[in-house]
Amino acid sequence: MSGEALFKSIVSGEDQSVLGDIARSSLGLLSKGYEKAVSIRNARFDEGKGVTKVTVPVISVGNITAGGTGKTPMVRFICDVLTQKGLHPTVLSRGYRAEDNNKNIIISKDGTMLVEPSISGDEAWLLAKVLQKSNVIIGRERSKSAEIAINELGADCLIMDDGFQHRALARDIDIVLIDASNPFGYEHVLPRGLLREPLSGLQRADIIVLTKVDQVAPGIVSGIRKRLTQMIPNIPVYETT
């Protein structure tokens, strides 16, 4: 069993062994510290501290759980829609596994690749590869990437890839993707579960998109919708495969 599979068997409760129980208890203690840190950080942003506002519209695409929820197809879809309307979007990516994500680097311009995957990281490079008419910039500080996009690339709109928890850059629309096959991250924040922050964070969302709905029974999807309606009744929920 791989490390990832073992971790999921523990946090999901599938592993009912004594060691599994001990591991869950230990992870639960760590989760309390993590949740406290996230709450302090979010409270700061709620007050507007440390938030940069730019001169062009910003759309954030993100999630509330660790793991893939289909952000790349959504970012590509939004870019396609915007370019068809004559706009010039630039995608801001953190650049996971980049050679140095402390630097802000233009990795593609108008669909032309400017760096190798070893520089940008595979995930951002593959995203840039499929965006034929958009620009992609990587860097941990999205506000700096935003400045580069606006001042050097002439971007008139920005898309933050994996931006829901990156609150240092103000956004006009927050789109949150929820994986229908594991929507609520085993009900616990990391590392006891897969939630990147408490579910109450969904109140910041403007749009919820349930992804991978074709991988679960219709009854499960309706159950997720019912729970979301109870938590965030005024936020629209859409579905995609």
Question: What annotation goes with each model-predicted range?
Answer:
Residues M1, L27, S31, S118-G121, ...:
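Alpha-helix N-cap/helix-start motif at coil-to-helix transitions, marked by capping-box chemistry
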Residues S2-P57:
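A transmembrane-helix-recognition feature enriched in membrane-embedded lipid enzymes
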Residues L29, P57, P73, P89, ...:
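Proline-centered helix-kink/hinge sites
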Residues Y96-I232, V237-E239:
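Phosphate/Mg2+-binding loops and adjacent switch elements
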Residues N42-D110, Q215:
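Walker A (P-loop) phosphate-binding motif
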Residues S39-E47, Q230-T241:
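Short N-terminal or domain-adjacent regulatory/targeting segments
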